[in-house]
């Protein structure tokens, strides 16, 4: 995938972010290939409101990769994946992780399949269904959700997918006190980690939830 249309600053921002996150720069090429596809398809399909490539690096790629250390192996379902976030950056940076991108919107699912095809991501599948309709109960070690719903909403539609010891990794902005308080009694918050996303201002938290 040709990323020659991207400015040197875009590459530099990504390399800097990978260094801060202690991730190998070998991922620069596939991540920029994904970014190039996202920019191209976004002109027609409006996959994301963010248009500036440098902002995309920070708010999409580096934000997704900030949770990479928590999901290096096993099977992961990315619920409401949208344009593939955080699922595709995680799959690129964790080749041993098997990722299912769950996205019911047809246009977004077509984009995801094209990314998988062009980047040759053998560890990624796309399920064009709503999370609650995915018939794969007790299959996944991890669920991710970046902008899908409240914690209660996420476990309601996708909790059945987790293995008994599996974890939901929900990406949030400010510390979600109210959402945590509203979790059903058979779910418990294992940890809340502040996320340091390179070049991003504003609060980010990763909430890890598991079944009791």
UniProtKB/Swiss-Prot annotation:
It comes from the Bacteria. It is an enzyme of class 2 (transferase). Keywords: Cytoplasm, Methyltransferase, rRNA processing, S-adenosyl-L-methionine, Transferase. S-adenosyl-L-methionine binds at residues 80, 85, 131-132, 146. One of its GO terms (cellular component) is cytosol. Its main location: cytoplasm. It is found in: Cytoplasm. Its EC number is 2.1.1.170. Pfam families: GidB (PF02527). It catalyses: guanosine(527) in 16S rRNA + S-adenosyl-L-methionine = N(7)-methylguanosine(527) in 16S rRNA + S-adenosyl-L-homocysteine. The keyword Transcription does not apply. GO terms for molecular function: rRNA (guanine-N7-)-methyltransferase activity. PANTHER family: S-ADENOSYL-L-METHIONINE-DEPENDENT METHYLTRANSFERASES SUPERFAMILY PROTEIN. Specifically methylates the N7 position of guanine in position 527 of 16S rRNA. Belongs to the methyltransferase superfamily. RNA methyltransferase RsmG family. This is Ribosomal RNA small subunit methyltransferase G. It comes from Xylella fastidiosa (strain 9a5c).
